[in-house]
Amino acid sequence: MTINLPEKEAKRVQIAVDRNPVETSFQKWAKPGHFSRTLAKGPNTTTWIWNLHADAHDFDSHTSDLQDISRKVFSAHFGQLGIILIWLSGMYFHGARFSNYEAWLSDPTHIKPSAQIVWPIVGQEILNGDVGGGFQGVQITSGFFQLWRASGITSELQLYTTAVVGLVLAGAMFFAGWFHYHKAAPKLEWFQNVESMLNHHLGGLLGLGSLGWAGHQIHVSLPVNKLLDAGVDPKEIPLPHEFFLNKQLMIDLYPSFAKGLTPFFTLQWSEYSDFLTFKGGLNEVTGGLNLSDTAHHHLAIAVLFLIAGHMYRTNWGIGHSIKEILDAHKGPLTGEGHKGLYEILTTSWHAQLAINLALFGSLSIVVAHHMYSMPPYPYLATDYATQLSLFTHHCWIGGFCIVGAGAHAAIFMVRDYDPTNNYNNLLDRVLRHRDAIISHLNWVSIFLGFHSFGLYIHNDTMSALGRPQDMFSDTAIQLQPVFAQWVQNTHFMAPQLTAPNALAATSATWGGDVVAVGGKVAMMPISLGTADFMVHHIHAFTIHVTVLILLKGVLFARSSRLIPDKANLGFRFPCDGPGRGGTCQVSAWDHVFLGLFWMYNSLSIVIFHFSWKMQSDVFGTVVNNTVSHITAGNFAQSANTINGWLRDFLWSQSSQVIQSYGSALSAYGLIFLGAHFILLTGMLDIFSGRGYWQELIESILWSHAKLKVAPTIQPRALSITQGRAVGVAHYLLGGIATTWSFFLARIIAVG
C-alpha cells in the first residue's frame, strides 16, 4: 500500500476565472490619471504631465493587489502582441504594395531590396535611388526579402494575404486583452501555476511552434527554394498548396517522399536524409545556411521541447515540481541554497522579468553573432548593409534588455523583497557579501581599463615618436589571441572527427575556403591578430563596468552605508532630504541611468569593431580567385592605436555620410546632422543643474504674475531625476541615430 504525502500530490490544475470583474468604461478610460487619486484631480503644475507618464504603466502604484496587477500585465501583453502584429503586417504590406520583391527574387545578386518609394512633394524624390532592375526606391536593410525567400514566398499576392492575416490576428489579440481583463479574468492561482505554464510554453509555444515551422520548411520552403536555386522563374514555380495536393511534385525533388509516412512512424527517420540533412557550411548558390539543415534543426528542437512540455507535475502525480527542485538545490558552501526562491518568483513579477530580460538580452547578442557567421537566409550574406544593420540591431536590443534586467531586479529588491523569508539562502548570502563582490568587480574594471587603454596609449606614443618597431602589432611586438585562434582551429577540425558525414564546419569563419556568391564574399575565415586582442580587452573592460554599475544598483537598492533606510525612499529618489551631503543620485534608478550610458559605450565599441573588421577582412569582391576587401585589410595595421580608430575608421568612413547631400543617401546626411543635435540636447539636460532652470522659471513667472497674465498651470523645472531621464533618452536616441546614419550611408555607398 502506498501513501501519497500531501506535498507529493499534484495540485489539480483548474482554469479559475472571475466573470465580469471590471466594467468597461470609456468615461473612466478617457480621464487622464484615472489610476491615481492624486493625478485624477488634474494639473496644478507642469510636473503633473511627467508624473502621468511615469506612473501610467507602473501598475504597482495603482494597487497593491497582486491578482489585479497580474491581470493588468497579462492584458497588456495581448495589447503588445497586437501592436507587434500590426507592425509586422505593415512590413508585409509594404513588401506587397511598394516593393521590388518579385524583381529581386529573379536576380538577388544584382538587384537591391527596396520597399519604400518617397513621394515627390518638395524634391524628396531624390531619395529614390536606382536599386537595379529599373526600380527607383529607398534601399532597405531589414532582411525581410531574404526571410521571405527562405519562407518560400514567391509573389506579392502571398505577401498581401499574410499582411491581411496579420491584421486579423492583431484584432484577435486586442479582443483577448479586453476579454481577459473585463469579461473572464484569471485568478491569481492561475498565474502562479508554474508547472502548467512551463508545460504549455515549452510544449505548445516552442515544441508545436517549431514543429509547425519545420513542417512549413519541409513542405513549402524546401521545394520552392530548390527550384529557385536551380534558376526556375518564380512565376513558373507551383503554388504552396500544389506541393501538398500533388505528391509527385515532391517526389521529383525529394525521392524519399515516395516512402510516405512509414519511416516516420517506425522511427526510421534516416530514410528522409535527402531533406533532413546535416551538411554544415553554406549553400554555394545563395550563401545562406542549407535550408534542409535548418528544417532538420527545427524538427530536432520540436522533439526536444515536446518532451520538455511533459516534464512538470500537474494533474497526474508524475513529473517535476519546481518548488521541490529549488528547495532541494543546496551545495556544501551555499547554506539554504535556493530555498525561498520559488516564493519570490511566484509573487514578484519584477524578479521573474529581471531573469527573463537578462536571458533574452544575452540571447539577442548571441543571435547578432550568428546572423553573420552562419547567415540563415538566402542572399543575406552578400547584402552587406543588411548584415551590418542586423548585427547592430540585435546588439542594441540585447543591451536594452540587459539594462532592463538590472532595473527590474532593483525594483524587486525595493518593492517585493522580504528579508524575513530569505535567511541564509543564496540571495541573502549574495547580499551579505555584496561589498566583496562589488570591490572585486571594481578592481577588475580598473585593472582592465588601465591595462587595455595603456596598450593603446603605448602604441600611439611609439607611433608619434616614429618607432613602429616598438609598437604592439602583428609586424612588431605581437600579442596574438592564441586561445581564440585555438578555438577557431578546433571548430574547423572537429567535424572531421565528431561529424564525419558533415560536408563542412558549422561556420566558414572558423577556417577553410572563401564562400563567394555572384562575385561577392559571403563568408570566409576571419583571422584574428594583435588589434583584435587589444579591442577585445576594451570590450571586457566596458562590459565589466556595465555589470558593476547594474549589480551595485541591485545589491545596494535597499540599503547602503550612507543611507541604511534606502528601501523606504523607493526605487527612484533625487537626494535623501535636505542636510545630508553625498546622498544625491544614489538611488537604484540612478544606477540604471548610468548603466544605460555604459551599455551604449560597450555596444558602440562592439559594433564599430564589427563594422571595420568586416569591411577590412571579410566584405569584398572576388575576381579570378583573388579577394579585394573594401578597406583592403587595414584593420590589423590601424586598429591598434587610438589615432588609427579616429583617422581610419571614424573620420575616413564618415566621408560618405558627410558628402551625401544631393544624392539618394542625403536623408542619412540630414539624420547624421539632426541626431548630433539630439545628442547635444541630451548632454544639456544631463549637465545643467535643476536650480538654474527653477530660478529662470521663477523670475519669468514673477513678471507674468505682476502683469496678471500668469498661467493657471504653474511651470516647474524638471526634478533632478526627470532631467536625467530626459537627458539619457536624448543621448541614446541621438547616439543611435548618429551611428545608424553613419553606418548605412557608408555601407550602402561602398558595399
From Swiss-Prot:
Chlorophyll a' binds at H676. It catalyses: reduced [plastocyanin] + hnu + oxidized [2Fe-2S]-[ferredoxin] = oxidized [plastocyanin] + reduced [2Fe-2S]-[ferredoxin]. Coiled coil: none annotated. Its EC number is 1.97.1.12. It is found in: Plastid, Chloroplast thylakoid membrane. The chain crosses the membrane at residues 73-96, 159-182, 198-222, 294-312, 349-372, 388-414, 436-458, 533-551, 591-612, 665-687, 725-745. Keywords: 4Fe-4S, Chlorophyll, Chloroplast, Chromophore, Electron transport, Iron, Iron-sulfur, Magnesium, Membrane, Metal-binding, Oxidoreductase, Photosynthesis, Photosystem I, Plastid, Thylakoid, Transmembrane, Transmembrane helix, Transport. InterPro entries: PSI_PsaA (IPR006243), PSI_PsaA/B (IPR001280), PSI_PsaA/B_CS (IPR020586), PSI_PsaA/B_sf (IPR036408). Gene3D superfamilies: Photosystem I PsaA/PsaB (1.20.1130.10). [4Fe-4S] cluster binds at C575, C584. It is an enzyme of class 1 (oxidoreductase). GO terms for molecular function: 4 iron, 4 sulfur cluster binding; chlorophyll binding; electron transfer activity; magnesium ion binding; oxidoreductase activity. Its main location: plastid. P700 is a chlorophyll a/chlorophyll a' dimer, A0 is one or more chlorophyll a, A1 is one or both phylloquinones and FX is a shared 4Fe-4S iron-sulfur center. It is a multi-pass membrane protein. Phylloquinone binds at W693. GO terms for biological process: photosynthesis. Chlorophyll a binds at M683, Y692. PROSITE patterns: PHOTOSYSTEM_I_PSAAB. PsaA and PsaB bind P700, the primary electron donor of photosystem I (PSI), as well as the electron acceptors A0, A1 and FX. PSI is a plastocyanin/cytochrome c6-ferredoxin oxidoreductase, converting photonic excitation into a charge separation, which transfers an electron from the donor P700 chlorophyll pair to the spectroscopically characterized acceptors A0, A1, FX, FA and FB in turn. Oxidized P700 is reduced on the lumenal side of the thylakoid membrane by plastocyanin or cytochrome c6. PANTHER family: OUTER MEMBRANE PROTEIN, OMPA-RELATED, PHOTOSYSTEM I P700 CHLOROPHYLL A APOPROTEIN A1-RELATED. The PsaA/B heterodimer binds the P700 chlorophyll special pair and subsequent electron acceptors. PSI consists of a core antenna complex that captures photons, and an electron transfer chain that converts photonic excitation into a charge separation. The eukaryotic PSI reaction center is composed of at least 11 subunits. This is Photosystem I P700 chlorophyll a apoprotein A1. It comes from Stigeoclonium helveticum (Green alga). The gene is psaA.
